[in-house]
A protein has these predicted regions:
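Short loop/turn microsegments at loop-to-beta-strand junctions
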Residues: 21-22, 47, 151-153
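Short beta-strand/turn micro-motifs composed of small residues
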Residues: 51, 82, 158
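Structural microenvironment flanking redox-active thiols in thiol-disulfide oxidoreductases
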Residues: 60-113
Length: 224
């Protein structure tokens, strides 16, 4: 199953399961100041895919796949997080609306908070990544092959930002390949939760933060 394949790779951020992402506000390409906990509310869990910058070939490839397979997204919602500013994405897309949120985190605050990893050289490569880069190069994309590359992170979160599942990618393409895979992961997470005991008590705060406020959050005790 997609969940088993991801779990077998090892998860460096697995200790975060059962904790909560603090409340914060975020910008999308078209709307500033959105409430993260409002995004988490509802009857369906939220799958968050952390990607490199919006102009990165891997980001473009997977956002396109998710757009093309959106009809398969049942029982779960999707949000993609990118290391780009809302203005940059809005300019690149000419202000187009996306059918799922694009959370813009140019400074990488969420990436740091959740321990999103980077890798250099061949350690981050896969055959799929090579194909993506080859196509991008043919289309004029230039990149520094020696520069560290952001590895993807897949999260499933519930109410109040509670982390139900987390997977740190081992390569640049170690993430759900399309919306069908996202749906299957969410189903298996739900089945696991239904069968097992309750996880650790949710850590959350009533205070609404901005992304920069997340820095140093663990230095204080915010259990309520």
């Amino acid at each position: 199953s997609p969940l088993e394949r991801m779990c077998n790779c090892g998860m460096s951020s697995e200790h975060l399961v059962g904790t909560s992402i603090p409340r914060f506000t975020f910008d999308t390409p078209t709307t500033p100041g959105n409430d993260f906990y409002a995004l988490c509310a509802g009857t369906e869990p939220l799958c968050m895919i952390f990607l490199p910058g919006f102009d990165h070939p891997v980001t473009r490839e997977y956002v396109t796949r998710y757009l093309k397979t959106l009809s398969a997204l049942k029982g779960v919602r999707l949000a993609c997080v990118v290391r780009s500013s809302a203005r940059t994405v809005a300019q690149a897309t000419q202000g187009a609306e996306f059918p799922f949120p694009i959370i813009c985190d140019a400074p990488g605050v969420l990436y740091s908070y959740l321990g999103v990893e980077q890798a250099r050289g061949l350690r981050s490569w896969s055959f799929a990544a090579q194909r993506i880069y080859k196509t991008a190069k043919e289309q004029g994309y230039r990149y520094d092959s020696s520069a560290p590359q952001i590895l993807p992170l897949t999260l499933v979160v519930g109410h109040l930002g509670k982390i139900l599942f987390i997977h740190s990618g081992r390569s640049q393409t170690d993430l759900p390949e399309d919306c069908t895979a996202i749906r299957e992961i969410a189903r298996e997470v739900a089945s696991t939760l239904a069968a097992g005991p309750e996880g650790p008590r949710t850590r959350c705060s009533d205070e609404t933060l901005t992304l920069p406020d997340l820095v140093g959050w663990d230095d204080v005790d915010n259990d309520r």
